[in-house]
Amino acid sequence: MAPWTLWRCCQRVVGWVPVLFITFVVVWSYYAYVVELCVFTIFGNEENGKTVVYLVAFHLFFVMFVWSYWMTIFTSPASPSKEFYLSNSEKERYEKEFSQERQQEILRRAARALPIYTTSASKTIRYCEKCQLIKPDRAHHCSACDSCILKMDHHCPWVNNCVGFSNYKFFLLFLLYSLLYCLFVAATVLEYFIKFWTNELTDTRAKFHVLFLFFVSAMFFISVLSLFSYHCWLVGKNRTTIESFRAPTFSYGPDGNGFSLGCSKNWRQVFGDEKKYWLLPIFSSLGDGCSFPTRLVGMDPEQASVTNQNEYARSSGSNQPFPIKPLSESKNRLLDSESQWLENGAEEGIVKSGTNNHVTVAIEN
């Protein structure tokens, strides 16, 4: 077996250690709460009504937590579609060229029909040498998964999976139900934690589980709260974790808010338009993960006119780094109804706005 193959196998095995740790803690918490607290402690003191209420509520949070955690782990990260791969002839020409300018020229021609509106910091086409494809907007190569991931947020060791377009909603729900699960356990255990701590109750076996259960649930609640709050802020801004540290580069320069459509629309991009699915770990995110609508940038009429002329002149040249027409020309429901397509030639697209004198800096999905 080659050393690299052996290393990858070991890496995959070790990657499941954090997941097994979380699984062990969850299984133990289930036993400690249901058996030691509800059955032996609360039901043993003849508090039957409280036992039933606690068990029903606990299992509701437990099922939603396990469901969302399972979906986050076992939902395969979405990869770029075949349109973003170079053809055999393009790949052959690209590999034969040693000049970076010539290589970029090949990539620019290949990207003309793709919905790509961001570049690298050096204004070059974002190309993955390992996957041999042109990276869609917001996609990045994950070294742990060894593939390009659509709208990659981060690789999470606690789920042993990449968090991206296909499972980001599940990841957020996993954090939410983790918080609710830990909060419910800590709040309902607190009464008996105090009784055991003050020796009002003397069952030594249940005492250990109840005391430890309170500390563990409170600790996890505090740690997950900060992470969940941070990701709620990211969703409101329509950013990924990667984009929060390194803003995407558009034709006019880096812009951390380039994909922001407003807080409400940003949330709907992740959770979808159907509110009945928002709290369920069922995929309902909008879009295909390969292209995304961008915000409208306000300009005065003279500046907008000059910008339109410059964009038209650049699109006519052979060195245009951005595509002229996306894969799909269907109007995205997230954008304002004022924005519309105006076809100018066979492959030219200029987006125009009505009363607010806005100009889009990137074409929507």
Swiss-Prot record:
Q: Name one GO molecular function term.
A: protein-cysteine S-palmitoyltransferase activity
Limits of the DHHC domain = 126-176
Q: Where does Zn(2+) 1 bind?
A: C128, C131, H141, C148
| Any one GO BP annotation for this protein | protein palmitoylation
The superkingdom of the source organism is Eukaryota
Statement: the UniProt record of this protein carries the keyword Glycosyltransferase = no
Q: Where does Zn(2+) 2 bind?
A: C142, C145, H155, C162
Q: Any idea of its EC number?
A: 2.3.1.225, 2.3.1.-
Q: Which membrane topology describes this protein?
A: Multi-pass membrane protein
Q: Which residues lie on this side of the membrane: Lumenal?
A: 36-53, 191-207
Effect of mutating L227W? Loss of catalytic activity
Q: What does this protein do?
A: Palmitoyltransferase that could catalyze the addition of palmitate onto various protein substrates. Catalyzes palmitoylation of Cys residues in the cytoplasmic C-terminus of EGFR, and modulates the duration of EGFR signaling by modulating palmitoylation-dependent EGFR internalization and degradation. Has a preference for acyl-CoA with C16 fatty acid chains. Can also utilize acyl-CoA with C14 and C18 fatty acid chains. May palmitoylate CALHM1 subunit of gustatory voltage-gated ion channels and modulate channel gating and kinetics.
Family as reported in the entry's similarity comment = Belongs to the DHHC palmitoyltransferase family.
Q: What is this protein called?
A: Palmitoyltransferase ZDHHC20
- Native species: Homo sapiens (Human)
Q: Top-down, what is the taxonomic lineage of the species of origin?
A: Eukaryota, Metazoa, Chordata, Craniata, Vertebrata
